[in-house]
């Protein structure tokens, strides 16, 4: 569903120190720890939507920093509100196309990546747009630390199975996988996204994996 343009969203985002434009994020490349004013590990969420997962993750891992990315101001403005309401200081939001992600991070700057329910791009000619495709994994390897884990969730079976191949081809070790996350031994650790809650209510199984950079 196409989002209705909210002309007030960008000014509201820019008024908050939590939000960074693409230009500001580029200037922070290699210096994100200065932005957070600590040396804690930095986790990255690719596609944060309205921020439900970000709030949970930043609260649970309050000794880590989290950078959450999304393209649309119209969703980021709601993520900002949720983060502010939760009084979290260890989160930053960036508005950008994830295809440019290597422009804002330096080598060894990220310690974990979350990819939750991204666009499955089912047509063969669009597969390279998948956030787990080898093309993207190659970009992530430019700025993640050795041993970094990528946590990936999807409701799409074809995307999940293809992603298993992408990770293997890109030099990642598969640590965990399940085709039914909510009935798995990882269920208690799982942090639910907005989409995931809706899928669960409809009986749609979530697939989940953890892959580690060797």
Curated annotation (Swiss-Prot):
One of its GO terms (molecular function) is tRNA (guanine(46)-N7)-methyltransferase activity. Coiled coil: none annotated. Its EC number is 2.1.1.33. Disulfide bonds: none annotated. Residues 125-130 are annotated as: Interaction with RNA. NCBIfam families: PRK00121.2-2, tRNA (guanosine(46)-N7)-methyltransferase TrmB. This is tRNA (guanine-N(7)-)-methyltransferase. It comes from Clostridium novyi (strain NT). The gene is trmB.
């Amino acid at each position: 569903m196409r989002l209705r343009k909210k002309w007030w969203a960008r000014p509201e985002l820019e008024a908050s120190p939590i939000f960074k434009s693409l230009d500001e994020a580029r200037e922070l490349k290699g210096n994100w720890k200065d932005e957070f004013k600590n040396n804690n590990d930095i986790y990255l969420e690719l596609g944060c939507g309205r921020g439900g997962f970000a709030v949970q993750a930043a609260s649970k891992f309050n000794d880590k920093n989290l950078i959450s990315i999304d393209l649309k101001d119209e969703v980021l403005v709601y993520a900002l509100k949720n983060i502010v309401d939760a009084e979290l200081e260890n989160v930053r939001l960036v508005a950008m196309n994830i295809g440019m992600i290597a422009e804002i991070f330096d080598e060894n700057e990220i310690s974990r990546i979350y990819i939750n329910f991204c666009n499955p791009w089912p047509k063969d000619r669009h597969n390279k747009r998948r956030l787990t495709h080898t093309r993207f994994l190659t970009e992530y390897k430019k700025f993640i630390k050795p041993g970094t884990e990528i946590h990936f969730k999807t409701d799409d079976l074809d995307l999940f199975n293809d992603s298993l191949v992408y990770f293997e081809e890109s030099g990642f070790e598969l640590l965990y996988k399940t085709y039914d996350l909510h009935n798995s031994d990882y269920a208690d650790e799982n942090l639910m996204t907005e989409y995931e809650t809706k899928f669960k209510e409809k009986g749609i199984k979530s697939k989940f994996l953890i892959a580690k950079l060797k």
